[in-house]
């Protein structure tokens, strides 16, 4: 379920970085592993994505997202304190580039 834009929490991002070779968009932010959803849900809403699946383990969160028919993964690893969006196909890298433009307003 998507929240109306008036109900979207503000997100705070320190930096973003695109990596075409890894088909990824790195997101640097203050993220609490135990409260990952508090960071991820507003992020997903700001990107106008839909959450299809949520998985987590001892040190990692992985959410399957969809953006206009493109499947993406939102990943967070506790020990490396790294968060990134990834695409499966090289043809979908332009989606990551577009999403990066949306995140720039949150820097």
Positions of predicted regions on the chain:
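A generic structural signal for beta-strand entry/edge sites
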Residues: 20-24, 60-62, 80-84
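Amphipathic, interaction-prone secondary-structure segments
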Residues: 47-73
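Short, charged, intrinsically disordered terminal tails
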Residues: 105-107
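Negatively charged, low-complexity tracts enriched in Asp/Glu with abundant Ser/Thr
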Residues: 2-56
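Short, compact, well-ordered microdomains
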Residues: 64-103
